[in-house]
Amino acid sequence: MSPIGSPDNVWLKPLRFEVALTVYLATLAWFAGWLPQGVTTTRWYRIYSACVVWAIAAEIIWIGGAASLGIASHFNESSPILGWTYRLMGGLAVLLTSSALVYGILILRNPNSRLDPAFKLSVGLGLVLTFVLTVAVAGYMANSGGHFVGISSTNAPGAPLMGWARDHGDLRVPHFFATHAMHFIPAFGFLAALALPHRRRTAPPLASAPSSPSSSPTRLARR
C-alpha cells in the first residue's frame, strides 16, 4: 500500500523493517554460538554471510528510499522499473531469510551440541519454519498483489504500531508469526526442557552466545 494517503506516518514502515531486521540479525548472532565448531571460519560461510548482510542493506535502503519519495516499496507495479525493483527486492528477501534455514539445519546436525535435546530441536525447527512459513506467506501476498483479505466495511484505523487491519483480513498477521517462529518455538522448547524432570540438570545454556565476534554474520561481512 502506498504511503501517499495512508493514515500511518510515512516513516513507520521503514522503522518497523529496521527493528525487525535488527532483531533478526541479533538472534542469528546469538544462535551462531550453537553452530558446529569451525563452521564460521569456513570460506563458504564468510561469503554467504556477506551476501546476506548486503541483501539486508539493500532492503533497508530501498524501503527507506521509497518512503522518502512517497512511493510504495511493496506491490508497486506502477512502472516497469518499480515492478522490476520490487521483484528484485523479493529475491533478496528470500536470500536473507534463507540464513534462518541454513542455521537451523547446521544446529540440528551438530553432533557435538551441548544443548538439551528438546531445546536443540525447538531451535532448529523454529529456524527452519521461519524460512518455510515466511516465504510461503510472502509469496502468497506477492501473487495476490497485497496483504489485505476482503474489503473494509468500516474504514477503522489499523492496530497501533503494527498497522494491521481490524475490520477485515490482513496477511501481515501470519507473516509476523512466521518470521518470529525462530523466537516463539525455541521459547516453548526452553520451557519444555525445564519442565521435564529428567532434563533439569541439562537445561539449555542460554548464556552460550558466540564468545567471539567472528561468529556474527555482520562481523564477517565487514572482513
Which sequence ranges carry the predicted segments?
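Juxtamembrane membrane-water interface segments of multi-pass membrane proteins
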Residues: 1-7, 25-48, 106-121, 141-145, ...
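Hydrophobic cores of alpha-helical transmembrane segments in multi-pass integral membrane proteins
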Residues: 1-2, 12-34, 48-68, 88-103, ...
